[in-house]
């Protein structure tokens, strides 16, 4: 077991989930849709991308860009790309009556090869 913290050592910091941030990730779709029937592969891949974005960015509201949708569906419903490079942007919700303060926008990043790619923070332009 880890040693117990003393009572007065609590840090009051604000959660990083409330900050606006943009990162690029490589998602291995292949392992996420392994064993899925042919006619459900592309739809499941999009659900898995949505789930990945929800987990990484901590926002229940995830919006997928049309170019990403086209990239997943480019080879048809059965032959989904093995990997895909995406940019996840956590943004403030402009809609006042929305239950969520933030949403995540998932956009497609075309790359020639996936070798030696890391998750990177992207500066807001």
UniProtKB/Swiss-Prot annotation:
Gene3D superfamilies: 3.10.440.10. Its main location: cytoplasm. GO terms for cellular component: cytoplasm; cytosol; cytosolic large ribosomal subunit; cytosolic ribosome; extracellular exosome; focal adhesion; membrane; nucleoplasm. The keyword Acetylation applies. The modification Phosphoserine is found at residues 15, 98. It comes from the Eukaryota. The modification N6-acetyllysine is found at residue 75. The keyword Phosphoprotein applies. The modification N-acetylmethionine is found at residue 1. Keywords: Acetylation, Cytoplasm, Phosphoprotein, Ribonucleoprotein, Ribosomal protein. One of its GO terms (biological process) is cytoplasmic translation. The modification N6-succinyllysine is found at residues 55, 70, 75. It is found in: Cytoplasm. One of its GO terms (molecular function) is RNA binding. SUPFAM superfamilies: Ribosomal protein L31e. Component of the large ribosomal subunit. Component of the large ribosomal subunit. The ribosome is a large ribonucleoprotein complex responsible for the synthesis of proteins in the cell. Belongs to the eukaryotic ribosomal protein eL31 family. This is Large ribosomal subunit protein eL31.
